[in-house]
Structure formats: C-alpha cells, structure tokens
Amino acid sequence: MAKEGLALEITELRLGLPGDNYSEISVCGSSKKKKRVLSDMMTSSALDTENENSVVSSVEDESLPVVKSQAVGWPPVCSYRRKKNNEEASKAIGYVKVSMDGVPYMRKIDLGSSNSYINLVTVLENLFGCLGIGVAKEGKKCEYIIIYEDKDRDWMLVGDVPWQMFKESCKRLRIVKRSDATGFGLQQD
C-alpha cells in the first residue's frame, strides 16, 4: 500500500548530522524537498515580509557559510574533567598516618603543608608533644628517629632522599626510639 502525499519523509531515518542540507529526494516518483534548517526558514520569512532593500541584505547573509549544529558529546567534557582531576590529585600530596613508639594512638599529617624536613620535625614535635625527634643527618643527637614506608613497602630513614622525592613516595611515618632503629644504617654509640 503506497500512501502518496502524506509527507512521510519527515519521519524517515537518515544517516548524517542534524541540519545537513540534503538535495531533493524522490518518494514514489515525486520530488519533494527535505525539512528546512532554521536558518533557511528565517531567511525565507524575511524575504516574504521585508522590502526590496532588506532582500539585498538577506541575500548577502545567505552567502555566508551556514553554521552546523554541534555534535552531541563534543567536546568530550567528561574525559577533560577526569584528566584534570587526576592531574590535581597527583599534585596534591595528601595525608599520611604517623605513629610513635609508646603512644597508643596514631595521627595524620598533611605532607603538602610542610616544605622541608626541619618543618616536618617541628610539626611532629608539636603533634606528639615531645622534643628530641630528628632526621637521619642529626641521628646521634636525637632520642627518636623518623622512618617512613615508601611505595615499595620498604622502611627507610627520613632525610636520606631529597624532600620532593620523599613527599612523592611516603605512605606512612613512624617515630621510633633511636636504640630500636637497627638495620637503618645508624651507628650506635
């Protein structure tokens, strides 16, 4: 059953982006025009209602290229946000757990707030309320030594590597008595 004159081409499925200007299509031997784009309708209504001077300006407007509608899902905003958040997360150092021998609780500190080993030692002394915490370079003078767990789950002395490398690899801090810190390269008196 062929139904002529019902304008079924409006609901016809086609491949292509919305707003593409298709040439005339033929349905059952008759030639009809495809649905018009909004810009075409605006210029044709302007031609009907305006005088001769405005017709000349609208013809000049038609010579400009027609802007096609933006494709759905472009630009890929979600992947941009995901990538940006991953970059920010990698820049942010974050909090690490700190435990001390003889203290029944653990604390967390933000390594990003410290800018050197000296500043880190000061923060830890204030946090646990004790003096005499030191890093590897001043190990003989201190009662306590700070060790840290790196990405490879190895325990190392704080102060053996440059500060930036320490911030990137530190997962956990532990404050131990100097006498208990054997196997870390400290020389006993």
Swiss-Prot record:
Keywords: Auxin signaling pathway, Nucleus, Repressor, Transcription, Transcription regulation. Induction: By auxin. InterPro entries: AUX/IAA_dom (IPR033389), AUX_IAA (IPR003311), PB1-like (IPR053793). GO terms for cellular component: nucleus. Pfam families: AUX_IAA. Residues 93-178 form the PB1 domain. It comes from the Eukaryota. PROSITE patterns: PB1. One of its GO terms (molecular function) is DNA-binding transcription factor activity. Highly expressed in stems and flowers. A motif (EAR-like (transcriptional repression)) lies at residues 13-17. One of its GO terms (biological process) is response to auxin. Changing C78R: In shy1-1; gain of function. Affects auxin-related developmental processes. Affects photomorphogenesis. The keyword Repressor applies. Signal peptide: none annotated. Transmembrane segments: none annotated. Belongs to the Aux/IAA family. Homodimers and heterodimers. Interacts with TPL. The N-terminal half of the protein contains two conserved domains I and II. Domain I includes a slightly degenerated ERF-associated amphiphilic repression (EAR) motif which seems to be involved in the activity of transcriptional repression. Domain II is required for the correct degradation of the protein through the SCF-mediated ubiquitin-proteasome pathway. Interactions between Aux/IAA proteins and auxin response factors (ARFs) occur through their C-terminal dimerization domains III and IV. Aux/IAA proteins are short-lived transcriptional factors that function as repressors of early auxin response genes at low auxin concentrations. Repression is thought to result from the interaction with auxin response factors (ARFs), proteins that bind to the auxin-responsive promoter element (AuxRE). Formation of heterodimers with ARF proteins may alter their ability to modulate early auxin response genes expression. This is Auxin-responsive protein IAA6.
